[in-house]
Amino acid sequence: MKRVKGAFDERAAALDGLLGVGRSFDMIGRTLRIGGRRARLWVVNGYADDTVLERAISAWLPIPSLEDVGTLQAFADRYVSVCDAAVETDRLKAVTAVFAGKTLLVIDGFSGGVVLDAKQFPLRSVEEPDTSKVLRGSHDGFGESVMKNAALLRRRIRDSQLTLESLQVGTRSRTDVVLCYMENRVDRKLLDQLRKKLEAMDVGSIAMSQESVAEAIAPPQWWNPFPKTRYTERPDVAAASVLEGDILLMIDNTPAVMLLPCSLFRFLEEVNDYYFPPLVGTYLRIVRVIVLFLTLFVTPLWYLLVKSPDTLHESLHFLLIEDEYYVPLILQLLLVEFIIDVLKLASLNTPDVLSNSFSMLGALILGDFAVQARWLVPEVLVYMAFVAIANYAQHSYEMGYAVKLCRMALLLLIWLFDWWGFIGGILGTLALIASTRPLIGKGYLYPFIPFNGKDLWALLHHRPIDRNNS
C-alpha cells in the first residue's frame, strides 16, 4: 500500500489537538513502531487496564512487516486479541470513544483507527442501596457504571428478548444512555415515543444524570410537584419491571434507573411487598395507602377542628389545646415543617461521628426547649412527628415532597378560608394530580383514568404467582 509522506504526522497532530495531548495531564499519546510502520496510541490515564494494554502492545511490537496486510480491518482480525475492538473511520466518533475510556490505535498507511475497549473505571463495590433495603431478597445494587448495571440485569433475565439499546445524549458530555426493554412485552408506541424524545434532546451536558434527562424530556410543568418518573437502585426491582413490559432508562454515572411509564398508583408498590406472603404483602400495601392519606390530612384536619372549637363535638374535645402559647398555630405548624427540612439537609452534611450528637441536639431544640419557651405546644410536636415519620413509609423521596407541599398549601387555605379553604384545597390537589402529564404512558391516573379494573386490582393487592408463572 502506498503511503503519503507527512499524512500520518498530520493525522496524529490533529488527533493530539482534539484529544488535548499536552494540554491535559491525564491524556496519553504514545508513538509506537508496528511492522516497520509508525503508529500512535491514545488512552486516558486512569481509564485503561494496564494488563490488557501491555499484552496488546507486546503482541504488536514483534510484528516483522505489515506489507501483506491490506486493510486496517485485516490487521484487527489478525493481531488484535481484545474482544471488544472495531475499526472506526469517523474521527469524531473515535475521539468520543477515547473520552469514554477506550483506546485508539492509528497506523501509518491505513485509514481510520482501531478502537479497543481496554477500560477499567474506578468503581465502588456492589452494595445494597441505603434507601431501599429489604429483610429478605438480594442485597446488591446498581452502581455508577452502565456496563456493570447491564450485567446485573442480564444475570436476572437470561432471555434473548431482553434488549439493551445504547444512545448518547449531550453535545459536550456525550453521556451513555441505555434503553432496556423486552422485545415481546414492550409497548412499541411508547418505546418509539421515548426514543424520539431522547434523540431530540438538544443539551450540552446531563451532568445531573437522570434528573437532567427527566427535565429535558418532561412536559413543561414546573409548578407541578408530583414526580413524573420512578427510580430504583435495585436490580431485582428493575428486572421485575422490565418483565412486566416497562422500559428502563439506564444513565451512565448514576446508580438510579428510571422506570417508565409512570402513574400515581405505581408509587404504591414497594419491593418488600413481594418478599413476603401475598396476604402480608397486601396488608403492607394497604397500610402504605392509609399512611399516605394520613400524611396529607392529619395536620390540616387537626388545625381545622382546633380553629373552630365551637363546632367540635364533645367526643372530640380531647383535640383542643389547653396550654397557653404565644405563637399562632399556623406559624407553629409551618415552622416545624421548615425545621424538619433544615434537619434533613443538615443531616446529609453531618459527619457520621457527629450524627448521634446532632440527633440529640435536634430533639432537645424541637422538644423540651421549644415547649418550655412556649414557642410550640406539645400537640403540634406530636402530629408533626407522626407526619415526619410516616413520610418515609413510601419509598419515593419526590412523592414525599409533593405531599408535603400540598399539605402546607392546605394549611394556608384553612387559615384563610376555614372549611371552604379545606374543600378548595382538596379539589385543587385532585386537579393538580389529574393535570400531571407523565413522560410517556396512558396517563398519570391510569389504571383509574382511563379505567382498567384488572390492572387496578393488581396494583392494590399482591397477587400470588399462578401455575403458569405469569
Question: What residue spans do the PLM features occupy?
Answer:
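Short polybasic/polar patches that bind polyanions
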Residues: 158, 199, 344, 371, ...
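Transmembrane alpha-helical segments that form the functional core of multipass membrane systems
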Residues: 249, 256, 262-410
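Membrane-embedded alpha-helical signal segments
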Residues: 1-301, 305-314, 318-320, 433-470
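Hydrophobic alpha-helical transmembrane segments of membrane transport and translocation systems
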Residues: 378-380, 384-470
